Amino acid sequence: DGIPSFVTAGKCASVANQDNFDLRRYAGRWYQTHIIENAYQPVTRCIHSNYEYSTNDYGFKVTTAGFNPNDEYLKIDFKVYPTKEFPAAHMLIDAPSVFAAPYEVIETDYETYSCVYSCITTDNYKSEFAFVFSRTPQTSGPAVEKTAAVFNKNGVEFSKFVPVSHTAECVYRA
């Protein structure tokens, strides 16, 4: 076994976090439109998530769904929640069979887009993932240009992102 392909030399970008992050406004349906590919995410197209705010957990119960490369429809349930050590927009992902990872909302307007960064540095290597979320499944338009500028400004190269396919056969049931 070698080093996984998503582990690369370097350190994580030091990204900004959304000021005055409002968990309740962030809740609801989001579509992934562009991603830095993630070996831990088995779905590769029609990716959508439902973020259900939970007052008891002070965070989100998340269901993400979509199709894997074998055209199987998969649903994954996990939690995303803030911690006392960081601002509210710097949360943790708690998912089955995955170590706890950061979930940093760099910027969102809550209505159209969200820029999310997740990266862990170990020694001089990083495991870097990032996501463009949209309230609609469109993969082009002004929101994409806006999110590209946000990531580039924060030291995350938007050229590393790939579009997520959202075609007519997509089913959104999460």
From Swiss-Prot:
Lineage start: Eukaryota, Metazoa, Ecdysozoa, Arthropoda, Crustacea
GO cellular component, one term: extracellular region
SUPFAM superfamilies attached to this UniProt entry: Lipocalins
Record-linked Pfam families: Lipocalin
InterPro entries in alphabetical order: Calycin, Invtbrt_color, Lipocalin_ApoD, Lipocalin_CS, Lipocln_cytosolic_FA-bd_dom
Organism annotation: Homarus gammarus (European lobster)
Cysteine disulfide links: C12-C119, C46-C170
Function comment: Binds the carotenoid astaxanthin (AXT) which provides the blue coloration to the carapace of the lobster.
A molecular-function term among this protein's GO annotations: pigment binding
Keywords, ordered alphabetically: Disulfide bond, Pigment, Secreted, Transport
BP GO terms, sorted: lipid metabolic process; response to reactive oxygen species
Main location: secreted
Quaternary organization: Oligomer; Can form dimers (beta-crustacyanin); or complexes of 16 subunits (alpha-crustacyanin). There are five types of subunits: A1, A2, A3, C1 and C2.
Subcellular location per the Swiss-Prot or TrEMBL entry: Secreted, Extracellular space
CDD domains: lipocalin_crustacyanin
Tissue expression per record: Found in the carapace.
PANTHER family: APOLIPOPROTEIN D
Family: Belongs to the calycin superfamily. Lipocalin family.
Lineage top rank: taxon: Eukaryota
Transmembrane listed as a keyword: no
Protein name: Crustacyanin-A2 subunit
